[in-house]
Regions:
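Rossmann-like NAD(P) dinucleotide-binding subdomain of oxidoreductase/dehydrogenase enzymes
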Residues: 124-268, 322, 394
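Short, well-ordered beta-strand elements within core beta-sheets of diverse protein domains
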Residues: 35-41, 56-62, 147-148, 258-261, ...
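Conserved C-terminal structural/oligomerization subdomain of aldehyde/semialdehyde dehydrogenase
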Residues: 31-37, 222, 259, 313, ...
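Residue-level signal for inorganic ion chemistry
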Residues: 32, 68, 90, 112, ...
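Glycine-rich loop-to-alpha-helix module at the N-terminal edge of alpha/beta enzyme cores
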Residues: 33-122, 133
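Structural signal for hydrophobic packing residues in well-ordered secondary-structure cores
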Residues: 57, 61, 76-83, 87, ...
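ALDH superfamily catalytic-core signature
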Residues: 232-374, 403, 437
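Hydrophobic face of amphipathic alpha-helices that form TPR/SEL1-like repeat modules
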Residues: 1-30
Length: 479
C-alpha cells in the first residue's frame, strides 16, 4: 500500500519539513480513503510564521501599492496556469463537484486580480480645519500582521478573500486552512514560492483550530484575525483575540430564509432555491436554509420543488460529471444532518423526499424536503448545512418577515416577487446583511459580504472589505 503524501508548512519563504510525531489524515469524503497527511502543527509553528510575517511587514508596506498589486497579479496568473490541478485537489479532498471546483478556482484568480485593481483607488482625505494655516490629513495605513483561519467549504477562494486585500494594503499574512481541506492551500503556497514573493509576506501553517488557530488569534503581534467558520469557533476566536484587544473579522453561520410570494415566478423561484440549497451539497452559509411560501401558491410551489429536488443527481465527483452534488465533508457532518432531520420529524415535520443517509462508502445525504413544519421547530432555527429544505406556509408579507427575522443569524435572505413595492418593503423589514431578489444567494466580489447578529463582525469583498485591512492615521499639520 502506498504511503499518502505528507505535506510541509510554508514559513518565511520556504517549505518547512515537519519533525513532529503527530500527523492528521486528510480523507476523501466520497470514498473515505486517506489521500494525504498534514502536520498536527502546534502553537510554536504558528509563532514562527507570525514572527516571519512581522519581520517582512515594514519592507512590504514600504512598497508602492501598485508594486504590491503586481505580485497579486502574478499569483492570479499562476493559479490559472495550474487550474486543472487545483480543481482536481478540491474535488478529491472536499467532495465538490467538478464544475463547481473549476468555478471556484477561476473565481479565485479573478478575485485576486480585482483586488489588485484597488492599488490606485483606496485613498485618504484632506479635511478642512477650523484653525488658520492648519491642514488635517487623514492617511489609510496597513494594520501590520494579519491572520486568516479558513473553513473547508470554499477553501481555495477563502485564501484569496483574506490574502488579497491584506497584501494589497501593505499587511502580511499567516493562513491556516481547515485540516479537512489543506491540499489546495499547499498548491497555493507552491505558486507563491514559484513567483518569488518576498519571504514572510505569505505564510501557511497546518494543524487544528484549538492549537494553531488559537495562537493565530491570541498572539500579541497579530493586528487582525479574519476567520470564517461556525459560530462556536468564532466565539472562541473572539474570546482569545479579546485578551490583546485584537481586531476580528468574523464570517460565521447562517440560516437564510427564502420568501416566495403569491405573484412570484414559480419556475424561477424553484430553480434559484434548489440551486442555492444543493450547491456544495448544501454546505454554504449564505444559501437558502428555510423556505416561506405564501398560501395562495403553496401547493403548486411544493409540487414543483419536489420535482426539482428529486431530479438532483449526486455521487462521486471524481468519477461523474453529470451530478449536482457530492458527499458531505465528513462523518460528523453527515451525522449532524441526520440528527437535525430526525429531530424535526420528532417535532412533527413530515419527510416527503429523502430523509435518510445513503448506505455504503462516502458521506452522502440525498436532497430532502420537510413539510408540516412550524416556525418554532429547531430545523427553522439551527443551521443544518446539508441539502435539506423545510417549508412553511404564510399569509402576509409581514408574517413572513417576522418569521424570517426570528433567528440568531443574519447573513443572507431572499424574496421572490414581481411587485417592486413588495420587494422594497421586504428590504426595509428584513434584518440581514444581504438580501437577494429573484435570484440565487451567491454574492459578487465587488459587493460586501457581511452578516448581522451571530453571523459575524466586519465583512469581505469590494471597497468596504478592503478597508477592513486598513486603519486611519490623522495628522494635524500647522504651517
Amino acid at each position: 500500500m502506498s504511503v499518502p503524501v505528507q505535506h510541509p508548512m510554508y514559513i518565511d519563504g520556504q517549505f518547512v519539513t515537519w519533525h513532529g510525531d503527530a500527523w492528521i489524515d486528510v480523507v476523501n469524503p466520497a470514498t473515505e480513503t486517506v489521500i494525504s497527511r498534514i502536520p498536527d502543527g502546534q502553537a510554536e509553528d504558528a509563532r514562527k510564521a507570525i514572527d516571519a510575517a512581522e519581520r517582512a511587514q515594514p519592507e512590504w508596506e514600504a512598497l508602492p501599492a501598485i508594486e504590491r498589486a503586481s505580485w497579486l497579479r502574478k499569483i492570479a496568473a499562476g493559479i490559472r496556469e495550474r487550474a486543472s490541478e487545483i480543481s482536481a485537489l478540491i474535488v478529491e479532498e472536499g467532495g465538490k463537484v467538478q464544475q463547481l471546483a473549476e468555478v471556484e478556482v477561476a473565481f479565485t484568480a479573478d478575485y485576486i486580480d480585482y483586488m489588485a485593481e484597488w492599488a490606485r483607488r483606496y485613498e485618504g482625505e484632506i479635511i478642512q480645519s477650523d484653525r488658520p494655516g492648519e491642514n488635517i490629513l487623514l492617511f489609510k495605513r496597513a494594520l501590520g500582521v494579519t491572520t486568516g483561519i479558513l473553513p473547508w467549504n470554499f477553501p481555495f477562494f477563502l485564501i484569496a478573500r483574506k490574502m488579497a486585500p491584506a497584501l494589497l494594503t501593505g499587511n502580511t499574512i499567516v493562513i491556516k486552512p481547515s485540516e479537512f481541506t489543506p491540499n489546495n492551500a499547499i498548491a497555493f503556497a507552491k505558486i507563491v514560492d514559484e513567483i518569488g514573493l518576498p519571504r514572510g509576506v505569505f505564510n501557511l501553517v497546518l494543524g487544528r483550530g484549538e492549537t494553531v488557530g488559537q495562537e493565530l488569534a491570541g498572539n500579541p503581534k497579530v493586528a487582525m484575525v479574519s476567520m470564517t467558520g461556525s459560530v462556536a469557533a468564532g466565539e472562541k476566536i473572539m474570546a482569545t483575540a479579546a485578551k490583546n484587544i485584537t481586531k476580528v473579522c468574523l464570517e460565521l453561520g447562517g440560516k437564510a430564509p427564502a420568501i416566495v410570494m403569491d405573484d412570484a415566478d414559480i419556475e424561477l423561484a424553484v430553480k434559484a432555491i434548489v440551486d442555492s440549497r444543493v450547491i456544495n451539497s448544501g454546505q454554504v452559509c449564505n444559501c437558502a436554509e428555510r423556505v416561506y411560501v405564501q398560501k395562495g401558491i403553496y401547493d403548486q410551489f411544493v409540487n414543483r420543488l419536489g420535482e426539482a429536488m428529486q431530479a438532483v443527481r449526486f455521487g462521486n465527483p471524481s468519477e461523474r460529471n453529470d451530478i449536482a452534488m457530492g458527499p458531505l465533508i465528513n462523518a460528523a457532518a453527515l451525522e449532524k444532518v441526520e440528527q437535525k432531520v430526525a429531530r424535526a420529524v420528532e417535532e412533527g415535520a413530515r419527510v416527503v423526499l429523502g430523509g435518510k443517509a445513503v448506505a455504503g462508502k462516502g458521506y452522502y445525504y440525498p436532497p430532502t424536503i420537510l413539510l408540516d413544519v412550524r416556525q418554532e421547530m429547531s430545523i427553522m432555527h439551527e443551521e443544518t448545512f446539508g441539502p435539506v429544505l423545510p417549508v412553511v406556509a404564510f399569509d402576509t408579507l409581514e408574517h413572513a418577515i417576522s418569521m424570517a427575522n426570528d433567528s440568531d443569524y443574519g447573513l443572507t435572505s431572499s424574496i421572490y416577487t414581481q411587485n417592486l413595492n413588495v420587494a422594497m418593503k421586504a428590504i426595509k423589514g428584513l434584518k440581514f446583511g444581504e438580501t437577494y431578489i429573484n435570484r440565487e444567494n451567491f454574492e459578487a466580489m465587488q459587493g460586501f459580504h457581511a452578516g448581522w447578529r451571530k453571523s459575524g463582525i466586519g465583512g469581505a469583498d469590494g471597497k468596504h472589505g478592503l478597508h477592513e485591512y486598513l486603519q486611519t492615521q490623522v495628522v494635524y499639520l500647522q504651517s
